[in-house]
Amino acid sequence: TFSVVLFYAFVFAYYAFENINLVPGIIFSGSFAVPISTLFLFYELNIRRNIPLWQILRLVLFGGILSMFIALILFQNTETLSYAFGASAAGIIEEPAKLGALLILMRGDRIKKYPYILNGLLLGAAVGCGFAAFESAGYALNIGLNSSVDEMINNIQIRGILSPFA
């Protein structure tokens, strides 16, 4: 899709011109490429078309940020869970954080406006998209600062491939 082409255009330009100013474009386009593409798949599957695009974008941005904030609070308060389950604790902590963010942002009678299963899939995918993109961008920045741009690009590619499944 267009977002993947945009990512590789940034990567090509970075290697061709060796300009460090292209790194934020690599991080941003790479972190959002696959989650946004997956989100638009769910948007197209929502045959009722009863959820406006602004609502979805609001959930991507605010839901992604809020779910990361909730997950960080949960990680901080459940350290024993991390010791007991290791890396598996991430899913146990992050998934309720995404659900919590969705429930907070969709509170009240607005939930009654979206009674269909595909509505729930789309709304949940929007929050998950924001979470995945912001988390991937954070990991990419960390690797880029502490290692090399090549390893950062590899990390973005691996997380991009895996992001629709987590």
Listing of model-derived features with the role each one plays in the protein:
Residues T1-A166:
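Hydrophobic alpha-helical segments at protein termini of multi-pass membrane proteins
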